[in-house]
Regions:
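Active-site-proximal helix-loop-helix substrate-binding element of RNase H-like nuclease domains
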Residues: 4-7, 11-14, 55, 60-170, ...
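N-terminal accessory regions of nucleic-acid-interacting proteins
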Residues: 1-35, 39
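Accessory DNA-binding and partner-docking regions appended to nucleic-acid-acting proteins
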Residues: 156, 176-430
Length: 430
């Protein structure tokens, strides 16, 4: 199996001037067929999720590496977007790249997602490198996937890696499409691709500070108040300076402060997590600021301390259904077993047949704990619920009868081995 280290014809230079950008637009306009696009962000280094490199490839239109920072706000972006909106755009794992592409000004109207398409086609390993090995018989190195793409100038070997990522996408798209046609699932994939483009941005998570790593060590509400305030201060500063929050002030430091409550600046600097991170210039240059912030945390009145457990707005966790909602629990066991069987029959992962949250919402039935008999009315109500929750027509056709049937089964199934294996991704996962 050949290992590719650079695209055929070599890696092109970075496009970082208006003149070279106009040349790119002309070349892409003369190309034919779909346009492959990829983007590199600086996750783990920067707070923002903006693109720091955009790669574009089109047959007959060339391979191009665009610097979106240098070209940000230029009128020529609109010309590029006009071309893109007229063609199918090929992206691997598009939900990761679409937000930063749209932020730059690229707004596809027709999508082919090679990662999602491969999932629906029934392939188990759907990362770009494994798919290239399986479907194209070529090997791609992935050693630069987690580097800091915000630095300038970018290293040549990084650019080779980035160019290859988009250079293989059109051939990969054709192979994935062939698999989907062969398995009669191309229409499934097309509906999912269209749904991705129509989807609204996700709502902000409630109480994101509760996801601080190490929260299992916290035993009291005062400690939670300290964590919340330091998390919020860190988030504000990280956003302003565009530095990844954990790189600015780590979760381990926040949790140590909440647990040990240093009373002096010396105590703070003596914390193991702080001593370890003092090598980090980002922390050293703000020591006085962080110590002042810590002192303010100690002044938070008890009336403002958060509850130990967040009050959820969504469904109760399935682990409590057996005791509190026994009928919903029984219905869920049947839904889960049926979805696993359907997943095997169609070679589609359960979470792509129907998302766990959607399946649980239908089955929970707003906690009514009703027994049902199979009827046209029940099937119609399940179908309407799935539509309201954003399920695609193909998902509704396959899953609505199954979920309606599950609502008629009031005796729970035993925890089968196959169900336990699928629990992480099935409708009972949290």
């Amino acid at each position: 199996m050949p290992a590719l280290t650079a695209p055929e014809g070599g890696t092109p230079p970075i496009v970082d001037s208006i003149e070279s950008f106009r040349d790119v637009i002309q070349k892409l306009q003369s190309g034919v067929g779909p346009i492959a696009i990829d983007a590199e962000r600086a996750s783990g280094f920067r707070y923002s999720a903006r693109a720091y490199l955009i790669q574009i490839f089109r047959r007959g239109g060339g391979l191009h590496l665009i610097d979106p920072i240098a070209l940000h706000g230029s009128q020529e972006i609109g010309l590029l977007n006009t071309i893109v909106r007229k063609e199918e755009v090929v992206i691997h794992a598009s939900t990761q790249d679409l937000p930063c592409l749209r932020d730059f000004g690229i707004q596809p109207t027709l999508l082919f997602d090679t990662e999602l398409g491969a999932r629906i086609a029934g392939l188990e390993r759907v990362g770009l490198a494994p798919l290239c090995e399986l479907l194209l018989d070529i090997s791609l190195a992935k050693e630069h996937s987690a580097v800091d793409w915000s630095i300038r100038p970018l290293h040549n070997d990084w650019l080779d890696y980035a160019a290859l990522d988009v250079f293989v996408l059109l051939d990969l798209r054709d192979r994935v499409e062939a698999l989907l046609l062969e398995s009669k699932k191309l229409e499934f994939a097309k509906q999912d691709f269209a749904a991705i483009l129509k989807a609204s941005p996700p709502l902000p998570k409630k109480d994101p500070w509760r996801r601080t790593s190490g929260m299992h060590l916290i035993k009291g509400r005062f400690e939670l108040a300290i964590i919340r305030q330091l998390w919020q201060i860190r988030d504000t500063v990280a956003r302003e300076v565009d530095i990844a929050a954990g790189r600015l002030f780590s979760d381990s430091i926040i949790v140590d402060i909440a647990r040990l409550k240093p009373q002096t600046k010396s105590d703070f600097l003596s914390l193991p997590s702080v001593r370890f991170r003092l090598k980090n210039e980002r922390l050293k240059e703000r020591i006085d600021f962080w110590w002042a912030s810590i002192q303010k945390c100690y002044e938070i009145p008890q009336s403002e301390w958060p509850e130990m457990r967040a009050r959820g707005d969504g469904l109760p966790p399935p682990r409590i259904w057996k005791e509190r909602f026994p009928l919903a629990h029984a219905h869920l066991t049947h839904a889960k077993a049926g979805l696993l069987e359907l997943s095997t029959q169609y070679s589609i992962p359960v979470e792509n047949l129907i998302t766990p949250e959607v399946a649980r919402t239908v089955i929970f039935d707003e906690g009514r704990e009703n027994s049902h008999a199979m009827s046209t009315d029940l099937l119609e109500r399940v179908t309407e619920k799935l539509i309201s929750l954003g399920a695609r027509p193909w998902q509704i056709e396959l899953c609505a009868p199954l979920l309606a049937h599950a609502l008629t089964c009031d005796e729970p199934l035993p925890p089968l081995i196959s169900e336990a294996q699928g629990s992480e991704q099935g409708p009972e996962s949290e």
